[in-house]
């Protein structure tokens, strides 16, 4: 599957999806002495300009508020959440372009937590076009064992048999470049027997309410491990992708160094 097609799909491409170019209401106010703040609403998102620098505000899943800097080096994505429409008959969201044409694919992600039996034919008939299957993960503990998802093989084969396009994701806990290579090799070995035409995704994220073996990783570490994985996947002939939420993209990953890769933007 070509990169261009997946950017148009429900898996959103580059991370800064909330800052597409567009017009909006502009408000100006004085914030501190000799500082002027301009606020503009773009695609439903508040963009703040202060002292020539642009920022955006967002909330995490716990409704904590954050303000992050917009990076000139990171290309803007044209994805506009105001173009999402709910199909009341199916209950699915669709994404329509400016001409009203549906321009996104519907997909799901699954793992062992969805249970032992998934009726993949029913999934297909419901309008789902692609699936991202969890391949496995690296454990939190000191050993950091690599573990295959208990339902990986069954889910991949079932989805393929139903005619769905299939990608995979791997949850990383790498603490060195060597471990990132191990994770890459683990993933490539497991997908080799299958016709994987969707993205091969590196899932790197914050571990909430628990300790993690990655707690001492730096921004440079996390960013470098993404590169190691994505470059290895690309070299093997697959399409790499990085999974992360807005907070992780804004404050942990160095997005300006990852612009050649697609992102699966997580928002709940």
Give, region by region, the residue ranges found by the protein language model.
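N-terminal Sec-pathway targeting helices
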Residues: 1-12
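Sec-dependent signal peptide cleavage junction
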Residues: 19-35
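Boundary/entry segment of secreted carbohydrate-active catalytic domains
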Residues: 34-136
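Acidic (Asp/Glu)-rich catalytic clusters
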Residues: 100, 119-127, 149-164, 187-196
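Structural recognition of the beta-strand scaffold that forms the well-ordered cores
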Residues: 106-109, 129-134, 165-170, 198-204, ...
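Acidic-and-aromatic substrate-binding clefts and catalytic sites of carbohydrate-active enzymes
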Residues: 107-118, 136-151, 173-182, 247-251
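Conserved, mostly hydrophobic/aromatic
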Residues: 108, 123, 159, 202, ...
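Surface-exposed substrate-engagement region within the catalytic domains
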Residues: 190-198, 204-268
């Amino acid at each position: 599957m070509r990169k261009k097609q997946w950017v148009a799909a429900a898996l959103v491409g580059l991370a800064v999806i909330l800052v597409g170019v567009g017009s909006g209401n502009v408000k100006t106010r004085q914030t501190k002495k000799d500082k002027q703040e301009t606020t503009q609403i773009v695609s439903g998102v508040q963009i703040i300009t202060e002292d020539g620098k642009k920022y955006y505000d967002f909330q995490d899943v716990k409704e904590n508020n954050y303000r992050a800097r917009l990076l000139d080096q990171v290309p803007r994505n044209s994805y506009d959440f105001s173009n999402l429409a709910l199909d009341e008959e199916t209950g699915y969201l669709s994404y329509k372009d400016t001409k009203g044409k549906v321009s996104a694919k519907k997909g799901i992600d699954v793992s062992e937590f969805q249970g032992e039996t998934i009726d993949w034919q029913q999934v297909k008939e419901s309008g789902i076009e692609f699936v991202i299957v969890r391949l496995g993960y690296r454990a939190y503990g000191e050993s950091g064992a690599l573990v295959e998802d208990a339902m990986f093989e069954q889910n991949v084969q079932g989805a393929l048999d139903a005619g769905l396009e299939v990608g995979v994701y791997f949850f990383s806990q790498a603490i060195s470049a060597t471990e990132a290579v191990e994770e890459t090799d683990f993933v490539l070995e497991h997908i080799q027997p299958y016709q994987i035409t969707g993205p091969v995704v590196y899932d790197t994220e914050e571990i909430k309410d628990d300790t993690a073996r990655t707690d001492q990783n730096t921004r440079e570490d996390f960013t470098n491990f993404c590169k190691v994985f994505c470059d290895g996947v690309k070299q093997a002939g697959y399409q790499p992708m990085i999974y992360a939420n807005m907070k992780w993209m804004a404050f942990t990953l160095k997005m300006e160094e990852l612009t050649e890769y697609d992102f699966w933007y997580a928002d709940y």
